[in-house]
């Protein structure tokens, strides 16, 4: 999910 990509 997006929080893993930041």
UniProtKB/Swiss-Prot annotation:
Keyword match Secreted: yes
Disulfide bonds: none
Location(s) in or outside the cell: Secreted
A GO cellular component entry from the record: extracellular region
Tissue specificity of this protein: Expressed by the skin glands.
A Gene Ontology BP annotation from the UniProt entry: defense response
Highest taxon of source: Eukaryota
Function: Putative defense peptide.
Family: Belongs to the frog skin active peptide (FSAP) family. Tryptophillin subfamily.
UniProt protein name: Tryptophyllin-3
Organism: Ascaphus truei (Coastal tailed frog)
């Amino acid at each position: 999910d997006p929080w893993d990509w930041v």
